[in-house]
Amino acid sequence: MGTNINKKIAVIGGSGFLGKSLLKLLLNENAEIILFTRKKNYQKNLNKIFPDNNIKCIQWNINNLNIIEENIKNVNCIINLCGILYENKNGDFFRVHTDVPAFLGKISLKNKIKTLI
């Protein structure tokens, strides 16, 4: 890329293959990243993968969407990578794939975040 974007970006659900690849690209562009993940203690794993990174890792789940809104102040962009492959006993498949994107759209408008991917 080589553009040195120097922006603050929130990544929702970036702990999988695509997420790690995206994080690498964003770090190479000097982006400040807020990563929301369901995984506990994921910051330690990130520090091993990306030493001296500029990533703040926040644990969240579908039942606590407000933690996202509380931590996206002054971000330039939200990138939604969250997803699950199959339904679970809690019925989260629909919520993750419809309610979360709707919520992200709502908070993007409310907080004047111009880019939602």
Walk through the language-model features, giving the residues of each.
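N-terminal Rossmann NAD(P)H-binding glycine-rich loop of SDR-like oxidoreductase domains
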Residues: 2-3, 7-29
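A structural signal for isolated positions on well-ordered beta-strands in alpha/beta enzyme cores
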Residues: 10, 32-34, 56, 117
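Active-site beta-alpha turn of Rossmann-fold NAD(P)-dependent dehydrogenases/reductases
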Residues: 13, 82, 117
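A short helix->loop->beta-strand "cap" motif at the edges of active sites that frequently abuts
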Residues: 31, 110-115
